[in-house]
Amino acid sequence: MNLNYTSPVPQMPTQRSTSFFIEDILLHKPKPLREVFPSPFSNSIASRMPLLEYGYPLMPTPILAPHPHHPLHKPEHHPYFFTSGMQMPALFQHHPELPGKHCRRRKARTVFSDSQLSGLEKRFEIQRYLSTPERVELATALSLSETQVKTWFQNRRMKHKKQLRKTQDDQKTPNDVDRSLENTSESEMHEKNTDGKNGMSPDRYTLDDNEDDVDIEDDICSPEHLL
């Protein structure tokens, strides 16, 4: 009788080693889904939707709704991410120091009435250069701003010089042209010297020769002097 008895060694189930082959990756099956039974307090469709193993619903959430968090992870609030109750990112939040409406500044063309143009022309015939107090006085009388009066006189003087040049170019005698230029320069210098003696400084600026109209750089958000 043979007493050499060896008990059979139980065979352990062989586990397939994890591999990165495409066949092994495709063989992995997703975890089974469990169905959530309807709650007595809710009859919505979302409550009967299948959930993943950790409780995330397979239902698309709104874009601006807060993202569901795992119970083990607390939601972190970051100023650049969407937060609960906000419809816009915190990056574009309103700053109290900034005005609600931003007024865009642009060049607005001023339209003068006939009475205003008549008053400006009459004053220009008498005096081509105005001091600051004279501009304020004329602007108040014509219901205009000081800037409008100043700009109109600037453009009007430039237009007057163009007219003189055109008249001088049409003349046939070169000596007459030179004589007219000298008279115009002497007249302007005399007016500037007279204003300087009275403590008034004439306006000095550079204008475009092609600009005959009046352009006022003003704030279009304020209804002041809109004609």
UniProtKB/Swiss-Prot annotation:
InterPro entries the record matches: HD, HD_metazoa, Homeobox_CS, Homeobox_TF, Homeodomain-like_sf
- Which Cys-Cys disulfides exist here? none
Q: Taxonomically, which superkingdom?
A: Eukaryota
Chief place where the protein resides = nucleus
Keyword terms of this UniProt record: Activator, DNA-binding, Homeobox, Nucleus, Transcription, Transcription regulation
Q: Which residues bind DNA?
A: 103-163
Record's subcellular location: Nucleus
The GO cellular component terms are: nucleus
Task: Return the Acidic residues bias intervals.
Answer: 208-221
A Pfam cross-reference name: Homeodomain
Annotated PROSITE patterns:
HOMEOBOX_1, HOMEOBOX_2
GO-annotated biological processes: brain development; cell differentiation; pineal gland development; regulation of transcription by RNA polymerase II; stem cell population maintenance
Under Gene Ontology molecular function, one entry of this record is: RNA polymerase II cis-regulatory region sequence-specific DNA binding
Asked whether the keyword Transcription regulation is assigned, the reply is: yes
Q: Where is this region: Disordered?
A: 157-227
Q: Where is the composition biased (Basic and acidic residues)?
A: 166-195
Purpose: DNA binding protein that function as transcriptional activator. May play a role in the determination and function of cell types in the brain.
The text of the family note is: Belongs to the distal-less homeobox family.
Please give the name of this protein. Answer: Brain-specific homeobox protein homolog
The species is: Danio rerio (Zebrafish)
